[in-house]
Amino acid sequence: MKIFIDVNVFIDVMTKRSGWSGSLRVLNLVRKSRDVESWTSALTMPLLYFFRHRVVDDTTARTDVRAILSRVQLVPMTEAILDQAIAAAGADFEDNIQLASAESISVDHLITRNKKDFAAAKISVLNPEEWLALQEVAALEAKLTPPPGP
C-alpha cells in the first residue's frame, strides 16, 4: 500500500495539537510496517522546519526534519506538479501542491487532518483515525481468512 502523508499530520505530532495521538499512531505504524510505503511532498520539509523553528532552536528543528526525512519518501517538486496545483480549483495553493504530488505517484490514500481541503481529489482522502480503522479491519480480515487448502 502506498500512502501520502499531508504536512498537517506531522505538525499534529510536533505541536501535540488536538488529534495528535491519531497522527502519531499513523507515523508509528508506517515506520514499523513493511507493507506501507509512505510519501510526502518535497514542500513538506521546509514547511515543517518553519513551523518547528518557531518554537524550538535551529538545531532541534533541523534534527526533527531529518528524522522525518529518514522515514518517508519525497515526491519531487516538478513543473508538472506546480502547473497542476496552479490550475486546480482549490483556494489553498499549498494543499493543491500536496494533492498534485499525491496524485502524481498514484497513492492509495492521502492522509490529512483537513479532508475538506481535498474535496476535488481523485484519490481516497482519509483522516488519521479513518486510515487506522481501515488498517485494523484489514488485519482482522486477514486473521479470519482461512489459509488456502491443498
Give residue ranges: language-model regions.
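A generic structural signal for short hydrophobic patches within well-formed alpha-helices
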Residues: 10, 45, 82, 118, ...
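Short, well-structured N-terminal submotif of metal-dependent ribonuclease cores
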Residues: 1-39, 55-60, 136-150
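Acidic, PIN/NYN-like endoribonuclease modules and their adjacent C-terminal/linker elements
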Residues: 2, 71, 104-150
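Amphipathic coiled-coil/heptad-repeat helices and related helical stalk/stem segments
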Residues: 23, 94-95
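Acidic active-site catalytic centers that drive phospho-/nucleotidyl reactions
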Residues: 6, 95, 114
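Short active-site alpha-helical segment characteristic of glycosyltransferases
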Residues: 98
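Acidic catalytic patch
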Residues: 42-44, 64-89
